[in-house]
Amino acid sequence: MLDNISKSNKYYLLDYCYMICLGKLVIYHSGDTLYYEGMEEWINRFNPTIALLPINGNDPSRKVAGNLNAEEAVKLSKRCNVQVVIPCHYDLFEFNTADVNEFIKAAKKYEQRFCVLELGGKFSSCEI
């Protein structure tokens, strides 16, 4: 997919995440991630417009890489002034999922704009 982006746009693969810059639109896809000190400062260097963040949390009994939980994802988005946060890492595997309704509650609580997509769903930047 990135091969089709014109040379005037940029993408960065940084550790295990992507920052995709398409003109003024900057998409941050964290991949598997846990919160760490200095995370906001690092993310804010790119001024992301949209963030795709995991919400399935960190439960060592699952024996898989841990992630942000719903509230952590929303708070991170808010602190990074992300215009729209899109949750991911839910409803894919029974043993490693989260209730997307907890994310929705947190987003409303912190007044963070969000978009919940169905599996295979689409989001248009025109919605921003």
Set out the residue ranges of the language-model regions:
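Cap/insert and terminal regions of metallo-dependent hydrolase folds
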Residues: 34-120
